[in-house]
Amino acid sequence: REKIGVMFGCFSYGTRVQLADGSTEKIGKIVNQKMDVEVMSYDPVTDQIVPRKVVNWFNNGPAEQFLQFTVEKSGGNGRSQFAATPNHLIRTPAGWTEAGDLIAGDRVLAAERHLLSDQQFQVILGSLMGGGNLSPNLHDRNGVRFRMGHGARQADYLEWKTALLGNIGHSVRENDQGARFVDFTPLPELGELRRAVYLGDGKKFLSEDYLKALTPLALAVWYMDDGSFTVRSKGVQQRTQGGSGRIEICVEAMAEGTRERLRDYLRDTHGLDVRLRSAGSGKSMLTFSTEATAKFQELVAPHMAPSMEHKLLPRFRGLGTVEPRFVEPAQRLVPARVLDVQVKPRTRSMNRFDIEVEGNHNYFVDGVMVHNSPETTTGGKALKFYASVRMDVRRIETLKDGSDAVGNRTRVKVVKNKVSPP
């Protein structure tokens, strides 16, 4: 068996490869003309998508069939399309997977433009804890739409937040009561965040990792969105010098377990004396002691909007230093849903093509990350056989602790079981 190689997959002539100059070219043309080009390739060491040279070209003769894939994307017509042999390796969030093992609904990794700076991501994290929300893109496109809205009296605050996200396309509308809403263009980089926060029960779920990621800017946005401040003393007497008061922040939109996690996070991470209580309206509130109020306001004061300084003690006002920070757009990997897999109708030429890419051994076809490999490896690396089992995992219900989602009940079915020679 030493002379038998392992077969790898290929693509049909018309599958478009992403070149380093931003254009695309048919893989068949690249191979037939042995084009000296650079393609975009993912570097796992730097976690960046970078240009790499094509160092080999393969026309591996006729294929029995090609699978035609349609994958969601944010731009253009909202679709990525390519045709591969069933044994070609496609990158998924779980690793490399043969094309023939993918079905509609599975997710693959695709290159999408990222626009958000770290500062902007914190604004969104804080807004989600408050009045902001994420909604899915329509028409099966990749991307998530961030939206925020405020009443007429908070118009200046809404403008301040919108300016921090000023490089993201958006539209503004106003309702009959004067409230304004800002809808941002869908961003693929927020897809995983939406999946983590919205579990289907109508309440926001914030994990330990979400809370650990929060900076004082995110906490400030949360406080400005949903917090209220009541002055207890104006600081005339020496023991209350500088004034004192109490913060309350509404947490009704959060799941019950999330409220407790948030309370514990504020206690353990920031040393704040906070407790949960139910207000007269039945809404859940997070209440700060006078000492915790001063400590929290000192933490968030440099990140407060000028129009929200009435939520600060006098000694913490005028300290805001937040300026918009934008970054250059960059291509990054995001999960993208497979919308459809079909056997491609036979064409006059059924030849299969592949390229070899310097260093990283991967490239992108219409935005989707795929493995590069020659049709065969050296025979010494051949395996005796492959065992491939595909299990279909379906969520059938959400497990809850009170009203907090803590897990899922799933049903698993073996849908493909094959043992075959290479």
Curated annotation (Swiss-Prot):
Keywords: ATP-binding, Autocatalytic cleavage, Cytoplasm, DNA damage, DNA recombination, DNA repair, DNA-binding, Nucleotide-binding, Protein splicing, SOS response. GO terms for biological process: DNA recombination; DNA repair; intein-mediated protein splicing; SOS response. GO terms for cellular component: cytosol. It is found in: Cytoplasm. Pfam families: LAGLIDADG_2 (PF03161), RecA (PF00154). One of its GO terms (molecular function) is ATP-dependent activity, acting on DNA. Its main location: cytoplasm. SUPFAM superfamilies: Hedgehog/intein (Hint) domain (SSF51294), Homing endonucleases (SSF55608), P-loop containing nucleoside triphosphate hydrolases (SSF52540). This protein undergoes a protein self splicing that involves a post-translational excision of the intervening region (intein) followed by peptide ligation. The keyword Glycoprotein does not apply. Belongs to the RecA family. Can catalyze the hydrolysis of ATP in the presence of single-stranded DNA, the ATP-dependent uptake of single-stranded DNA by duplex DNA, and the ATP-dependent hybridization of homologous single-stranded DNAs. It interacts with LexA causing its activation and leading to its autocatalytic cleavage. This is Protein RecA. The lineage of its organism: Bacteria, Bacillati, Actinomycetota, Actinomycetes, Mycobacteriales.
